[in-house]
Amino acid sequence: MQKTSNTLALGSLTALFFLMGFITVLNDILIPHLKPIFDLTYFEASLIQFCFFGAYFIMGGVFGNVISKIGYPFGVVLGFVITATGCALFYPAAHFGSYGFFLGALFILASGIVCLQTAGNPFVTLLSKGKEARNLVLVQAFNSLGTTLGPIFGSLLIFSTTKMGDNASLIDKLADAKSVQMPYLGLAVFSLLLALIMYLLKLPDVEKEMPKETTQKSLFSHKHFVFGALGIFFYVGGEVAIGSFLVLSFEKLLNLDSQSSAHYLVYYWGGAMVGRFLGSVLMNKIAPNKYLAFNALSSIVLIALAIIIGGKIALFALTFVGFFNSIMFPTIFSLATLNLGHLTSKASGVISMAIVGGALIPPIQGAVTDMLTATESNLLYAYGVPLLCYFYILFFALKGYKQEENS
């Protein structure tokens, strides 16, 4: 079988980004689902995101080195296999009714996503040749399609089978925990199927086809890369923090049940999908850094309004932040890795480590929310945590993205 062309390779990678989005957003369903089952505090529930995104920090550098040796195509296949393993482990985790087991399975699942992320993002940029930001935004739009459909299927398959009330017995809680078994087992099978397809496609290893550079330069000597990695840290942290507590916020402030509240996640992540498809067109006319600056500023305004105004308007404002999140990750990534040459795979590994922001920022917001709950204060004040994240993104878009003359 001949090697796949660049266009077909880019097309096949959309399945990778779709699955990453679909699986990642299910954490936003797991948090309100497992919180009452295991009687968790907001902080303890946010450990779901801590374990999932903590894998990025622990495994990002590891996979960056591994992929630089085995190449992007095999990195993608390896990522799908590890992801399938983590998904399959949800079955015994639910059977034994162990929150710790769930967190362990999540870490393995997330390690697979880290591998896919580390291989997938630079793979797209190297295949794009001059259209890095636009093409990465386009394939990330399919990631957003996954994050849009994830809450719909997650709420239907998980919340619809939940029968637990406030005074549920241990047997009822274990039964509700098992509602995640079949959805995640299905994801395991789908991941293995994608691994087989990617292997048979024989994707081109574009990095090995690049001419070798004669000079070696430290990755961290590129300031625009360092600022960009920090930008990814704060972007993922802010986005995940808002998504993690959106369902719980709707439940608390609007007295909605979990399944009804979960539907609003569709608008949050669906907004990102619309924004990415729109961004793939507008980036032909607007400079990526200017587009990023506008979206960061818009997010700051929306979150500030939510904190100040409160009520339904606040929650709808927070939901609309998803639209402006749309182009942030691919734009920051492409600006941070521009002109890095053979350092690109290692840079991708470091950026994958920076996604640990999704592990650290939500627990901080969770701890703040617990404190506000204890003092019967406005829970929306906790959204000041992700607000600070977007201020850094604005800095990167205005100044941090600039490359030094000799880089």
Curated annotation (Swiss-Prot):
**Cross-referenced InterPro entries, in alphabetical order?**
Glc/Gal_transptr_bac, MFS, MFS_trans_sf, MFS_TsgA-like
Q: Which domain of life is it from?
A: Bacteria
User: Subcellular location, in the record's words?
Assistant: Cell inner membrane
Biological processes, Gene Ontology terms: D-glucose transmembrane transport
This entry carries the following GO cellular component terms, namely:
plasma membrane
Q: How does it sit in the membrane?
A: Multi-pass membrane protein
Q: Where are the transmembrane segments?
A: 11-31, 47-67, 70-90, 96-116, 139-159, 180-200, 225-245, 263-283, 300-320, 321-341, 349-369, 378-398
CDD domains, from UniProt? MFS_FucP_like (cd17394)
Is Secreted there in the keyword field? Answer: no
- What is a single molecular function from GO for this protein? D-glucose transmembrane transporter activity
What does the UniProt keyword field contain? Cell inner membrane, Cell membrane, Membrane, Sugar transport, Transmembrane, Transmembrane helix, Transport
Purpose of the protein: Intake of glucose and galactose.
Q: Which PANTHER family does UniProt cross-reference here?
A: L-FUCOSE-PROTON SYMPORTER (PTHR43702), PROTEIN TSGA (PTHR43702:SF3)
Which family is it part of?
Belongs to the major facilitator superfamily. FHS transporter (TC 2.A.1.7) family.
Q: What is this protein called?
A: Putative glucose/galactose transporter
